[in-house]
Protein backbone atom coordinates (compact mmCIF):
# COMPACT_ATOMS: atom_id res chain seq x y z
CA UNK A 1 0.00 0.00 0.00
CA UNK A 2 1.54 3.30 -1.06
CA UNK A 3 -0.94 5.65 0.58
CA UNK A 4 -3.25 5.61 3.57
CA UNK A 5 -6.89 6.63 3.27
CA UNK A 6 -9.00 7.82 6.19
CA UNK A 7 -12.60 9.07 6.34
CA UNK A 8 -13.82 11.74 8.73
CA UNK A 9 -16.44 14.49 8.77
CA UNK A 10 -17.73 13.59 5.30
CA UNK A 11 -14.29 13.94 3.73
CA UNK A 12 -11.56 11.53 2.74
CA UNK A 13 -7.98 12.15 3.83
CA UNK A 14 -5.01 10.62 2.05
CA UNK A 15 -1.32 10.60 2.82
CA UNK A 16 1.65 8.68 1.43
CA UNK A 17 3.03 6.00 3.70
CA UNK A 18 5.68 3.86 2.04
CA UNK A 19 8.98 5.30 0.80
CA UNK A 20 10.84 3.91 -2.17
CA UNK A 21 13.33 2.14 0.08
CA UNK A 22 10.69 -0.47 0.83
CA UNK A 23 10.27 0.63 4.43
CA UNK A 24 7.50 2.62 6.05
CA UNK A 25 7.09 6.36 6.53
CA UNK A 26 9.61 6.34 9.39
CA UNK A 27 12.38 4.88 7.23
CA UNK A 28 14.62 7.95 7.12
CA UNK A 29 17.93 6.12 6.79
CA UNK A 30 18.23 7.01 3.11
CA UNK A 31 18.40 10.78 2.80
CA UNK A 32 18.42 10.71 -1.00
CA UNK A 33 14.95 9.33 -1.72
CA UNK A 34 13.34 12.65 -2.65
CA UNK A 35 16.41 13.71 -4.60
CA UNK A 36 16.17 10.51 -6.64
CA UNK A 37 12.45 10.97 -7.28
CA UNK A 38 13.09 14.49 -8.59
CA UNK A 39 15.53 13.19 -11.22
CA UNK A 40 13.45 12.63 -14.39
CA UNK A 41 15.96 10.03 -15.62
CA UNK A 42 15.92 7.87 -12.50
CA UNK A 43 13.97 4.63 -12.04
CA UNK A 44 12.68 6.08 -8.77
CA UNK A 45 11.06 8.95 -10.68
CA UNK A 46 9.32 6.49 -13.02
CA UNK A 47 8.13 4.37 -10.10
CA UNK A 48 6.80 7.35 -8.20
CA UNK A 49 4.95 8.52 -11.28
CA UNK A 50 3.30 5.10 -11.41
CA UNK A 51 2.20 5.61 -7.81
CA UNK A 52 0.76 8.99 -8.69
CA UNK A 53 -1.06 7.43 -11.64
CA UNK A 54 -2.64 4.87 -9.33
CA UNK A 55 -3.73 7.64 -6.98
CA UNK A 56 -5.10 9.67 -9.90
CA UNK A 57 -7.08 6.67 -11.16
CA UNK A 58 -8.49 6.16 -7.68
CA UNK A 59 -9.45 9.82 -7.28
CA UNK A 60 -11.08 10.04 -10.71
CA UNK A 61 -13.21 6.98 -9.95
CA UNK A 62 -14.27 8.14 -6.49
CA UNK A 63 -17.86 9.19 -7.18
CA UNK A 64 -20.99 9.55 -5.12
CA UNK A 65 -24.44 8.19 -5.84
CA UNK A 66 -25.14 11.31 -7.91
CA UNK A 67 -22.19 10.53 -10.18
CA UNK A 68 -20.18 13.54 -9.05
CA UNK A 69 -16.57 13.22 -7.97
CA UNK A 70 -16.02 13.07 -4.21
CA UNK A 71 -13.46 15.58 -2.93
CA UNK A 72 -10.90 14.51 -0.38
CA UNK A 73 -8.14 16.20 1.52
CA UNK A 74 -4.74 15.03 0.32
CA UNK A 75 -1.83 15.75 2.64
CA UNK A 76 0.93 13.67 1.12
CA UNK A 77 3.90 14.88 3.16
CA UNK A 78 2.51 15.66 6.59
CA UNK A 79 4.65 16.80 9.52
CA UNK A 80 7.41 17.83 7.14
CA UNK A 81 8.86 19.96 9.95
CA UNK A 82 9.97 16.75 11.66
CA UNK A 83 12.99 14.50 11.09
CA UNK A 84 11.17 11.14 11.23
CA UNK A 85 9.71 10.88 7.67
CA UNK A 86 11.63 10.26 4.49
CA UNK A 87 10.30 13.59 3.17
CA UNK A 88 11.09 15.47 6.40
CA UNK A 89 13.64 18.04 7.47
CA UNK A 90 16.41 15.46 7.95
CA UNK A 91 16.11 13.93 4.48
CA UNK A 92 15.44 16.94 2.25
CA UNK A 93 16.68 20.44 1.70
CA UNK A 94 14.16 23.26 1.60
CA UNK A 95 14.28 23.44 -2.19
CA UNK A 96 14.01 19.66 -2.59
CA UNK A 97 10.86 19.58 -0.49
CA UNK A 98 9.31 22.50 -2.37
CA UNK A 99 10.16 20.94 -5.74
CA UNK A 100 8.81 17.57 -4.57
CA UNK A 101 5.52 19.09 -3.44
CA UNK A 102 5.11 21.04 -6.67
CA UNK A 103 6.00 18.02 -8.78
CA UNK A 104 3.27 16.01 -7.07
CA UNK A 105 0.60 18.68 -7.47
CA UNK A 106 1.62 19.51 -11.04
CA UNK A 107 1.39 15.90 -12.16
CA UNK A 108 -1.93 15.11 -10.47
CA UNK A 109 -3.68 18.41 -11.12
CA UNK A 110 -2.22 19.59 -14.42
CA UNK A 111 -1.08 16.42 -16.18
CA UNK A 112 -3.74 13.96 -15.02
CA UNK A 113 -6.53 16.52 -14.59
CA UNK A 114 -7.47 15.49 -11.06
CA UNK A 115 -9.48 18.32 -9.48
CA UNK A 116 -11.15 16.64 -6.53
CA UNK A 117 -8.00 16.63 -4.39
CA UNK A 118 -7.67 19.32 -1.73
CA UNK A 119 -3.93 19.74 -1.18
CA UNK A 120 -3.21 20.19 2.52
CA UNK A 121 0.05 21.05 4.22
CA UNK A 122 0.34 20.21 7.91
CA UNK A 123 3.43 21.07 9.98
CA UNK A 124 3.63 19.59 13.46
CA UNK A 125 3.09 22.14 16.25
CA UNK A 126 2.95 20.59 19.72
CA UNK A 127 4.45 23.36 21.87
CA UNK A 128 4.36 27.12 22.24
CA UNK A 129 6.65 28.83 19.72
CA UNK A 130 8.24 32.25 19.61
CA UNK A 131 7.72 32.21 15.83
CA UNK A 132 4.61 30.12 15.21
CA UNK A 133 4.04 31.75 11.85
CA UNK A 134 7.52 30.72 10.76
CA UNK A 135 6.68 27.13 11.62
CA UNK A 136 3.46 27.30 9.61
CA UNK A 137 5.31 28.74 6.62
CA UNK A 138 8.21 26.27 6.94
CA UNK A 139 9.15 25.18 3.40
CA UNK A 140 5.96 26.73 2.03
CA UNK A 141 5.54 25.49 -1.58
CA UNK A 142 3.73 28.64 -2.74
CA UNK A 143 0.14 29.83 -2.52
CA UNK A 144 -0.90 28.28 -5.83
CA UNK A 145 0.28 24.85 -4.67
CA UNK A 146 -1.65 24.60 -1.39
CA UNK A 147 -5.43 24.53 -0.87
CA UNK A 148 -5.73 23.88 2.85
CA UNK A 149 -3.56 24.81 5.82
CA UNK A 150 -3.47 22.33 8.66
CA UNK A 151 -1.45 21.65 11.75
CA UNK A 152 -0.81 18.46 13.69
CA UNK A 153 -0.89 19.47 17.35
CA UNK A 154 -0.28 16.92 20.08
CA UNK A 155 -0.31 19.39 22.92
CA UNK A 156 -1.37 16.91 25.58
CA UNK A 157 -2.86 18.90 28.45
CA UNK A 158 -1.00 22.09 27.48
CA UNK A 159 -4.07 24.11 26.51
CA UNK A 160 -1.99 27.28 26.20
CA UNK A 161 0.04 25.71 23.39
CA UNK A 162 -3.08 24.60 21.53
CA UNK A 163 -4.66 28.03 21.94
CA UNK A 164 -1.62 29.97 20.73
CA UNK A 165 -1.08 27.65 17.77
CA UNK A 166 -4.74 27.87 16.78
CA UNK A 167 -4.46 31.65 16.81
CA UNK A 168 -1.36 31.54 14.60
CA UNK A 169 -3.04 29.04 12.28
CA UNK A 170 -6.14 31.16 11.76
CA UNK A 171 -4.09 34.31 11.25
CA UNK A 172 -1.98 32.56 8.62
CA UNK A 173 -5.16 31.21 7.04
CA UNK A 174 -6.62 34.70 6.71
CA UNK A 175 -3.36 35.99 5.28
CA UNK A 176 -3.29 33.26 2.64
CA UNK A 177 -7.08 33.31 2.03
CA UNK A 178 -7.26 29.55 2.51
CA UNK A 179 -9.33 27.36 4.84
CA UNK A 180 -7.57 25.81 7.81
CA UNK A 181 -8.04 23.14 10.41
CA UNK A 182 -6.42 20.81 12.91
CA UNK A 183 -5.37 17.80 10.85
CA UNK A 184 -4.23 15.68 13.82
CA UNK A 185 -4.59 16.00 17.56
CA UNK A 186 -5.56 14.00 20.61
CA UNK A 187 -4.17 12.51 23.77
CA UNK A 188 -3.38 8.86 24.16
CA UNK A 189 -5.68 7.12 26.66
CA UNK A 190 -7.45 10.30 27.87
CA UNK A 191 -6.15 10.81 31.40
CA UNK A 192 -8.24 13.95 32.03
CA UNK A 193 -12.01 13.69 32.51
CA UNK A 194 -12.81 17.06 30.94
CA UNK A 195 -10.20 16.75 28.17
CA UNK A 196 -12.71 17.17 25.33
CA UNK A 197 -14.45 20.22 26.75
CA UNK A 198 -11.48 22.05 28.26
CA UNK A 199 -8.42 21.00 26.23
CA UNK A 200 -10.05 20.73 22.79
CA UNK A 201 -13.44 22.46 22.60
CA UNK A 202 -12.66 25.56 24.68
CA UNK A 203 -9.65 26.67 22.59
CA UNK A 204 -11.46 25.83 19.34
CA UNK A 205 -14.43 28.05 20.13
CA UNK A 206 -12.17 31.11 20.11
CA UNK A 207 -10.92 30.58 16.54
CA UNK A 208 -12.42 29.91 13.13
CA UNK A 209 -11.27 26.54 11.81
CA UNK A 210 -12.98 24.24 9.32
CA UNK A 211 -12.40 20.98 11.15
CA UNK A 212 -10.52 19.11 13.83
CA UNK A 213 -9.46 15.49 13.33
CA UNK A 214 -8.35 13.10 16.06
CA UNK A 215 -5.62 10.55 15.50
CA UNK A 216 -6.35 6.85 15.24
CA UNK A 217 -7.52 4.11 17.51
CA UNK A 218 -5.31 1.06 17.04
CA UNK A 219 -5.49 -2.33 18.65
CA UNK A 220 -2.06 -3.42 19.87
CA UNK A 221 -2.04 -6.80 21.59
CA UNK A 222 0.31 -5.78 24.39
CA UNK A 223 -1.23 -2.35 25.02
CA UNK A 224 -4.84 -2.71 23.88
CA UNK A 225 -6.08 -0.39 26.60
CA UNK A 226 -3.72 2.44 25.67
CA UNK A 227 -3.47 3.37 22.00
CA UNK A 228 -6.72 5.20 21.35
CA UNK A 229 -7.27 8.85 20.52
CA UNK A 230 -10.81 9.11 19.20
CA UNK A 231 -13.21 7.78 21.83
Kindly give the residue locations of the regions a language model identified:
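Substrate-binding cleft of extracellular glycoside hydrolase catalytic domains
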Residues: 2-114, 215
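Structural preference for beta-strand elements that scaffold enzyme active sites
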Residues: 9-13, 69-75, 116-120, 145-150, ...
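Amphipathic, non-transmembrane alpha-helical secondary structure
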Residues: 49-60, 98, 102, 160-171, ...
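Acidic (Asp/Glu)-rich catalytic clusters
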Residues: 2-8, 58-68, 138-144, 169-175, ...
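Glycoside hydrolase catalytic-domain groove-lining segments
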Residues: 8, 133-135, 139-191, 227-231
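Aromatic-lined carbohydrate-recognition surfaces of secreted/lumenal glycan-active proteins
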Residues: 75-77, 101-134, 178-190, 214
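Substrate-binding cleft of secreted/luminal carbohydrate-active enzymes
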Residues: 178-231
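Solvent-exposed loop/turn segments at secondary-structure junctions
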Residues: 19-20, 78-82, 124-129, 153-158, ...
Amino acid sequence: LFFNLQFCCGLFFAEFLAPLTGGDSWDNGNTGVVRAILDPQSPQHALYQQWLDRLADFALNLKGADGNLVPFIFRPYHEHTQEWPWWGSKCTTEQEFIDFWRMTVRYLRDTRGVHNLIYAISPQMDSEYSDARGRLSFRWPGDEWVDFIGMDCYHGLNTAAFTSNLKALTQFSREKLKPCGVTETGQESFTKADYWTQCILAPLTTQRVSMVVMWRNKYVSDESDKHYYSV
